[in-house]
Amino acid sequence: MRCLIDFWVYLATVTGHILSHRIRLFLYRHLFRIKIGKDSSIHWLARFNQPAGIAIGHNTIIGNDAFLDGRFVWERKEHKSIAAYSREFFNPIVRPLQIGNNVSIAGEVRIYTMEHDIDSPDFKEIGAPVVIEDYVVIGSRVTILPGVTIGKGAVVASGAVVTHDVAPYTVVGGVPAEFIKNRSKDLRYQLKFARLFQ
């Protein structure tokens, strides 16, 4: 089973090297089952872990060499922690990574739904869903950790590490990401950036 998952991730990575944007989108939607909204764009070299666990809204841009983690998250019977790839877990969350409409995700962003528990003697995988709401802007080389919700209209400055929720219409930055200022709530733009090659 693990070999099949690894091969599937490899195929999704190879797809990111296809030059034609339209061909990549077709494969992401129909072969890898990523839910991708109308007029959204996934740039060259984007990579996915468990792509079927990812939902992307309309008019959203995913930048070059972004990494999106859609690993399925399963809730433990004790309702205390979350992990994957084990029969002792149940209740899958179907789309653990949800990205809204008109979201701009710059290049080299890393979004994770899973990590390892460093205090576990077995180094167990734990995680939680990540939600990125509408009109969010994420700068280059940002890292978003499991369980984070980034509120509508928020901006995450380049290089930030997001370890906790970001309030709507705020700008955050730093390691770990902290509040910088508020953003205008009057957002009506639509991101339409699809090109044949990108």
Label every model-predicted segment.
Residues 168-170, 178:
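Glycine-centered loop/turn positions within well-structured domains
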